[in-house]
């Protein structure tokens, strides 16, 4: 399965173009995604969004704004003008959610884009499990520390 979920900030405003022939909107942008254990380090992930999703991102998201995207990783290659083979890796955005509104971190309206299937609940805890889902009377067999292989 090829599925990716990222939360990051745009490094610059999205670049919106339209494909020749079909006229399909194509938005390209880069997300700066903080690393989990080293908050002072980030990875810069190239993203591409097509159609209405791309148009919406280009219209409402600007440099520095926080965005959640879900999609898949796509690799490719092309021949550069100097004749060398260049390789690319992009996240193709399938859906997205605005994380902040650009005014102090308030949550943005996620209803702008079609293709946005996070439904405004991205990052919110899933309350479908309760403490009662786990029976405290389960038969728990004690394990001796010497039986643990590490």
Swiss-Prot record:
Region described as Disordered: 129-150
List GO molecular-function terms, semicolon-separated: single-stranded DNA binding
Q: Specify whether DNA-binding is a keyword of the entry.
A: yes
What keywords are assigned to this protein? Answer: DNA-binding
Q: Which SUPFAM superfamilies match?
A: Nucleic acid-binding proteins
PROSITE patterns this protein is in? SSB
Provide the protein name.
Single-stranded DNA-binding protein
Organism of this sequence:
Clostridium perfringens (strain 13 / Type A)
What gene codes for this chain?
Answer: ssb
């Amino acid at each position: 399965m090829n599925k990716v979920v990222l939360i990051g900030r745009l490094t610059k405003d999205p670049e919106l173009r339209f494909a020749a022939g079909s006229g399909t909107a194509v938005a390209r942008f880069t997300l700066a995604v903080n690393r989990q254990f080293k908050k002072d380090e980030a990875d810069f992930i190239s993203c591409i969004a097509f159609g209405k999703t791309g148009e919406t991102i280009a219209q409402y998201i600007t440099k520095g704004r926080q965005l959640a995207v879900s999609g898949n990783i796509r690799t490719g290659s092309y021949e550069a003008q100097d004749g060398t083979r260049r390789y690319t890796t992009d996240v193709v955005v399938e859906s997205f959610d605005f994380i902040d509104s650009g005014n102090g971190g308030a949550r943005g309206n996620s209803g702008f884009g079609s293709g946005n299937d996070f439904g405004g609940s991205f990052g919110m805890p899933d309350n479908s499990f309760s403490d009662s889902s786990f029976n405290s009377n389960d038969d728990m067999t004690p394990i001796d520390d010497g039986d643990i292989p590490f």
